From Swiss-Prot:
Keywords noted in UniProt: Isomerase, tRNA processing
NCBIfam families: TruB
Gene Ontology MF annotations: RNA binding; tRNA pseudouridine(55) synthase activity
Family the entry assigns: Belongs to the pseudouridine synthase TruB family. Type 1 subfamily.
Protein name, entry field: tRNA pseudouridine synthase B
Signal sequence interval, chain numbering: none
EC number assigned by the record: 5.4.99.25
One of the protein's GO biological processes: mRNA pseudouridine synthesis
Source organism (scientific name): Lactobacillus gasseri (strain ATCC 33323 / DSM 20243 / BCRC 14619 / CIP 102991 / JCM 1131 / KCTC 3163 / NCIMB 11718 / NCTC 13722 / AM63)
InterPro entries: PsdUridine_synth_cat_dom_sf, PsdUridine_synth_N, tRNA_psdUridine_synth_TruB, TruB_C
SUPFAM superfamilies (alphabetical): Pseudouridine synthase
Entry annotation: catalytic residues: D39 (nucleophile)
Broadest EC class assigned to this enzyme: isomerase
Pfam families with a match to the protein in the record: TruB_C_2, TruB_N
Amino acid sequence: MLNGIVVVNKPRGVTSSDCVYKLRKILQIRKIGHAGTLDPEVNGVLPIAIGQATKLIELMHEKPKSYIGSGMFGRATDSYDLDGKTIAEEKINTPFTSNEIIAGMEKLTGKLEQVPPIYSAVRVNGKRLYEYARENIPVERPKRKVNVYSYELTQDPEYDPLEKTESFNFAIRCSKGTYVRSLVNDLGEELGVPAVMTSLTRTSSSGYDLNQAVDLETIEAEIDTPGKWLQPIDSFFAELPQLQLSPDQFKRVSNGASISLNTSYAKVALVYNGHIKAIYRRQGKIYRPEMMLLKNE
């Protein structure tokens, strides 16, 4: 049985669930799930856990995510991207300088309370926000606490003198639950003009990046050589200190027992026969199991 993480390079025009469905069919596997939904028109890194790795999904969500994208000043939509209905337009007669845009981005960096777009999957009273929007039902959107670690302008903005709009490229590193579309919209609000996100690519998630991402077509063509496209469970815990278990220790760990270890780390990955078999956390003078991965081979 396959165990690990497939870093899928999701194309534009398909949902994250579509990718999981297709990969399930390709691999003929039941235990499968993704970590971090991408909107249909967003491409890039979509980590999909299979087998024992599905135990990691909650932890995978906790790691930062990175994006590159583009936006435009002069237009705003109800969805904050090009899929939505235009709700505001304004000619940009005097384009913003790089320094002005950077100053706006800096105000949107750090710990923020963010209002999600009305066209999003956030639930309010058991119903998704986009369902309220489609039915024209007013709803108060709940603020969410997010952390924007960095929001950077990646090159000088470009001004279109005919359309009187200004385009800009950005890079963002943020916590889970952050809506990048909202950050583009909010940047426009900081500068006093309408703004819309025009493209977005996720470049990293759950500790994996685009260099490790593969197309579903490649997986299907190379299904007999999983070493080319499957990230082992151990790779997810690369930052954790690892301890080798003796046969006697492994027997105790296999039974979920607490054990004494000759280390002082708060959390450790326990290795046996070359694979991580459990994650243990220190409590006082002993270590107790936090996650069991006994079938990780």
